[in-house]
Swiss-Prot record:
This is Polymerase delta-interacting protein 2. Keywords: DNA damage, DNA repair, Mitochondrion, Nucleus, Phosphoprotein, Transit peptide. Residues 235-360 form the ApaG domain. It is found in: Mitochondrion matrix; Nucleus. Residues 1-51 form a transit peptide. GO terms for biological process: error-free translesion synthesis; mitochondrion organization; mitotic spindle assembly; negative regulation of macroautophagy; positive regulation of focal adhesion assembly; positive regulation of mitotic cell cycle; positive regulation of mitotic cytokinesis; vascular associated smooth muscle cell proliferation. It comes from Homo sapiens. The gene is POLDIP2. Interacts with PCNA and POLD2. Interacts with SSBP1. Interacts with PRIMPOL; leading to enhance DNA polymerase activity of PRIMPOL. Interacts with POLH. Interacts with POLD1; leading to stimulate DNA polymerase activity of POLD1. Involved in DNA damage tolerance by regulating translesion synthesis (TLS) of templates carrying DNA damage lesions such as 8oxoG and abasic sites. May act by stimulating activity of DNA polymerases involved in TLS, such as PRIMPOL and polymerase delta (POLD1). It comes from the Eukaryota. The modification Phosphothreonine is found at residue 292. InterPro entries: ApaG_domain, ApaG_sf, Hemimethylated_DNA-bd_dom, Hemimethylated_DNA-bd_sf.
Length: 368
């Protein structure tokens, strides 16, 4: 757990995982450097892929940690399913699924764009489609390898005490889309190193996968459901840069005789082209139900100006926003720079900030 510090951004490594597995024969051995978190598919009859020297610690050798399974085209992965993240490259385990509404503006029916309006920016109407995401634990051994490129993911909560702005985090907890999961099996009874793994999951060799939910996991999920729930996902692509936004409601606090509502939002930027680009600026418009419209401009995101290349095509981070109203909207643009110095703007899909008006008190810590 100590290896996964409570930071809120996650840079992404190469896409070579998904490329190297295309057309593969299943099952395939899954290998890692002993004590390390970087993986490589083991050899087949035609190809052999090893860890690169930049990722493999000096003196470490590859060892088999599991066998890849065929990814599910239909249906859901069960609690206890081990997986490799196809984009981030970390080992993880599925805790439970979320059924989200995916609003994908790339597949929306072509409609005349409308002028921007304070309710959230006009543009084409998008219908939500049900899509499966998963709450997962990240293997602590892999966090240092992710953080070589950026920072590791954590889920943040409002602290339940006098400081209305205080946050606490659960490191190594993430949300993963169904298509990002590369499932594998392992004979290890504790294949994932995370402080919560053995608290949440019990080894049962008669089951498939051989890890079942403990009562502590079910109780924790029920207790913290309002603050963990993933309901809406928004996605849009501009000039081969895809932006995915997932908002989460965190709760309400009273400050100076007024109510302050808090949200967390997670953003993933993906370069779908081979050209190298760098994020330079962000430009946000934040509309509150109270009638205020705020503009926020700044350099980069979370103190970084990430480069998106063919080798490292994606970057993910989380941030927070508060309003003195129970709902609102956010939208905006990211400005990217090409190697020749030219710039282009990438749209951030508009998303709603909705609160739960019959909410209970947000959690003050880990509830079992």
């Amino acid at each position: 757990m100590a290896a996964c510090t409570a930071r809120r951004a996650l840079a992404v490594g190469s896409r070579w995982w998904s490329r190297s597995l295309t057309g593969a024969r299943w099952p395939r051995p899954l290998c890692a450097a002993a004590g390390a978190g970087a993986f490589s598919p083991a050899s087949t009859t035609t190809t052999r892929r090893h860890l690169s020297s930049r990722n493999r610690p000096e003196g470490k050798v590859l060892e088999t940690v599991g066998v890849f399974e065929v990814p599910k085209q239909n249906g859901k992965y069960e609690t206890g399913q081990l997986f490799l993240h196809s984009i981030f490259g970390y080992r993880g385990v599925v805790l439970f699924p979320w059924q989200a509404r995916l609003y994908d503006r790339d597949v929306a029916s072509a409609a005349p764009e409308k002028a921007e309006n304070p309710a959230g920016h006009g543009s084409k109407e998008v219908k939500g489609k049900t899509h499966t995401y998963y709450q997962v634990l990240i293997d602590a051994r892999d966090c240092p390898h992710i953080s070589q490129r950026s920072q590791t993911e954590a889920v943040t909560f409002l602290a339940n005490h006098d400081d209305s702005r205080a946050l606490y985090a659960i490191p190594g907890l993430d949300y993963v889309s169904h298509e990002d999961i590369l499932p594998y099996t392992s004979t290890d009874q504790v294949p994932i190193q995370h402080e919560l793994f053995e608290r949440f999951l019990l080894y049962d060799q008669t089951k498939a996968p051989p890890f079942v939910a403990r009562e502590t996991l079910r109780a924790w999920q029920e207790k913290n459901h309002p603050w963990l729930e993933l309901s809406d996902v928004h996605r849009e692509t501009t000039e081969n840069i895809r932006v995915t936004v997932i908002p989460f409601y965190m709760g309400m606090r009273e400050a100076q005789n007024s109510h302050v509502y808090w949200w967390r939002y997670c953003i993933r930027l993906e370069n779908l082209d081979s050209d190298v680009v760098q994020l330079r600026e962000r430009h946000w418009r934040i509309f509150s139900l109270s009638g205020t419209l705020e503009t926020v401009r700044g350099r980069g995101v979370v103190g970084r100006e990430p480069v998106l290349s063919k080798e490292q095509p994606a970057f993910q981070y989380s941030s927070h926003v508060s309003l003195q109203a129970s709902s609102g909207h956010m939208w905006g643009t990211f400005r990217f720079e090409r190697p020749d110095g030219s710039h282009f703007d990438v749209r951030i899909p508009p998303f709603s900030l909705e609160s739960n008006k019959d909410e209970k008190t947000p959690p003050s810590g880990l509830h079992w």
